[in-house]
Amino acid sequence: MARIAGVDLPRGKRVDIALTYIYGIGRTTAMKILDTTGVNWERSIDDLSADEVNEIRKELEQHYKVEGDLRREVSSNIKRLMDIGCYRGLRHRRGLPVHGQRTHTNARTRKGPRRGAVGKKK
C-alpha cells in the first residue's frame, strides 16, 4: 500500500482515482501530477514501483499544498475574515450561508436543525 502525504492510498484502485483520496487533490490535479511525473493513469496502485511513488510524492511536496497545510490555511483564512469583521466573517461567525444564498427558506444544512415553536401550555 502506497503512502503519500500521510494518506494510505487504496490498493487495487487506478492511480488517478487513488490520488483523489488526498485532501486538496481532485481528478484534474491528479491527472496533472501524473502527466508531469510520467506515470500512466490507467495503472493500479499495486503496479507502481517505489521510484514512481517517490516521484509522485516529490511532485506533491514541491508544487502542491495538501492535507494538513491546506486545512490549516483554509481555517486561518476564515479566522482572518472573522477577525477583521467583514460581512463574510460575520456570516461565518453566525453559521449562515456566506455566498449570498437566500435564508428565508432553505439553508437548513448551514443553519442546523429547526428549533420547534413553543406549544400552548395547558
From Swiss-Prot:
InterPro entries: Rbsml_uS13_C, Ribosomal_uS13, Ribosomal_uS13-like_H2TH, Ribosomal_uS13_bac-type, Ribosomal_uS13_CS. One of its GO terms (molecular function) is structural constituent of ribosome. It comes from the Bacteria. GO terms for biological process: translation. Pfam families: Ribosomal_S13. GO terms for cellular component: cytosol; small ribosomal subunit. Located at the top of the head of the 30S subunit, it contacts several helices of the 16S rRNA. In the 70S ribosome it contacts the 23S rRNA (bridge B1a) and protein L5 of the 50S subunit (bridge B1b), connecting the 2 subunits; these bridges are implicated in subunit movement. Contacts the tRNAs in the A and P-sites. It comes from Desulfovibrio desulfuricans (strain ATCC 27774 / DSM 6949 / MB). The lineage of its organism: Bacteria, Pseudomonadati, Thermodesulfobacteriota, Desulfovibrionia, Desulfovibrionales. This is Small ribosomal subunit protein uS13. Part of the 30S ribosomal subunit. Forms a loose heterodimer with protein S19. Forms two bridges to the 50S subunit in the 70S ribosome. Keywords: Ribonucleoprotein, Ribosomal protein, RNA-binding, rRNA-binding, tRNA-binding. Gene3D superfamilies: 1.10.8.50, 30s ribosomal protein s13, domain 2 (4.10.910.10). Transmembrane segments: none annotated. PROSITE patterns: RIBOSOMAL_S13_1, RIBOSOMAL_S13_2. Residues 95-122 are annotated as: Disordered. PANTHER family: 30S RIBOSOMAL PROTEIN S13/40S RIBOSOMAL PROTEIN S18, SMALL RIBOSOMAL SUBUNIT PROTEIN US13M.
